[in-house]
Swiss-Prot record:
Biased composition regions of type Basic and acidic residues, renumbered to the chain: 1-10, 24-43, 68-105
InterPro entries given in the database record: Ribosomal_Su5_D2-typ_SF, Ribosomal_uS5, Ribosomal_uS5_bac-type, Ribosomal_uS5_C, Ribosomal_uS5_N, Ribosomal_uS5_N_CS, Ribsml_uS5_D2-typ_fold_subgr
PROSITE patterns with a match to the protein in the record: RIBOSOMAL_S5, S5_DSRBD
Annotated Low complexity bias: 14-23, 44-67
Classification lineage: Bacteria, Pseudomonadati, Pseudomonadota, Alphaproteobacteria, Sphingomonadales
Domain comment quoted from the record: The N-terminal domain interacts with the head of the 30S subunit; the C-terminal domain interacts with the body and contacts protein S4. The interaction surface between S4 and S5 is involved in control of translational fidelity.
Subunit-structure text: Part of the 30S ribosomal subunit. Contacts proteins S4 and S8.
Protein name per its UniProtKB record: Small ribosomal subunit protein uS5
Keywords per UniProt: Ribonucleoprotein, Ribosomal protein, RNA-binding, rRNA-binding
Positions of the S5 DRBM domain: 110-173
Length: 284
């Protein structure tokens, strides 16, 4: 037998398989990092040089932008500085315009006056529930007036309910020359008694408390009133409306009786033309 040959490093390298040799070679070579590869690629890429005309144009555009004030929010985006754009309208201006539109739609010439607010409570099994009651008078200032009341847990909601109820129950009152009542009248509700009287021009509204709100909303400029028996605003308002509902105009009386308005005025000493003029002024 032949003697075993001693294994040396040279012999091991010769007998190694090709795959192992390739793996050892890869381990021996240093690997490049990702940053190094990017830097190498940028260095190899040639830079594009600007022409003299392009450089001058860019410089002039930059100087012009620095000289002009910066606009915040344009017509396209509708930013806050631009006060709302034409396309989207999301800025402050767009919101304000929409709010103003709603206000114009709600403002239909009706006068709203808050007469009284009081706190109310309801006793339930778990305790007391507190709320608010509102009394509101509304009118158009041209002979129509109404009142309503509303209850809610919050004051604004109570006022809103009272206003809606008042708008539904408006009545028309005949006015003389558009400024005062045609004749005196009395009204009563509960313990409250109210007296209303016609007045000459320049008298003003001689009324206090809830009654003044009624005549201001009605459009009366001259009237004298008196209230006795109660200071409850609800009773005073109801008594005032009772007196106003009894108001009649000479025109309506003449129609019921089949006569002319001039005949009802009793102007025996006046001419027919003057009587007709007075009748036209007094009629609705």
């Amino acid at each position: 037998m032949m003697a075993d040959e001693k294994k040396t490093p040279e012999n091991e390298a010769e007998t190694a398989t090709p795959a192992v040799a390739v793996e050892d070679a890869l381990k021996a070579e240093p690997t490049e990092t990702l940053e190094a590869q990017k830097a190498k690629a940028e260095a190899e890429t040639p830079a594009v040089a600007e022409t003299p005309s392009e450089a001058a144009a860019n410089q002039s555009a930059a100087q012009g932008a620095e000289g002009q004030p910066r606009e915040r929010g344009g017509h396209d985006r509708g930013g806050r500085g631009g006060r709302g754009g034409n396309d989207r309208g999301r800025g402050r201006g767009g919101r304000d315009n929409r709010r103003g539109g709603r206000r114009e739609e709600e403002d239909d010439g009706i006068i709203e006056k808050l007469v009284h607010i009081n706190r109310v409570s309801k006793t339930v099994k778990g305790g007391k529930r507190f709320g608010f009651a509102a009394l509101v008078v509304v009118g158009d200032g041209q002979g129509r007036v109404g009142f309503g009341k509303g209850k809610a847990r919050e004051v604004p909601e109570a006022i809103q309910k009272a206003t809606a109820a008042a708008r539904k129950k408006m009545i028309r009152v005949a006015l003389k020359e558009g400024r005062t009542l045609h004749h005196d009248g009395n009204g009563r509700f509960g313990a409250g008694k109210v007296t209303v009287r016609t007045a000459p021009p320049g008298t003003g509204i001689i009324a206090g408390g809830p009654m003044r709100a009624v005549f201001e909303s009605l459009g009366v400029a001259d009237v004298v009133t008196k209230s006795v028996g109660t200071s409850n605003p609800y009773n005073m308002i109801r008594a005032t409306f009772d007196a106003l509902q009894d108001q009649t105009s000479p025109k309506s009386v003449a129609q019921r009786r089949g006569k002319k308005v001039a005949d009802l005025l009793g102007r025996g000493g006046a001419s027919e033309a003057e009587a007709e003029a007075d009748a036209a002024a007094i009629a609705e």
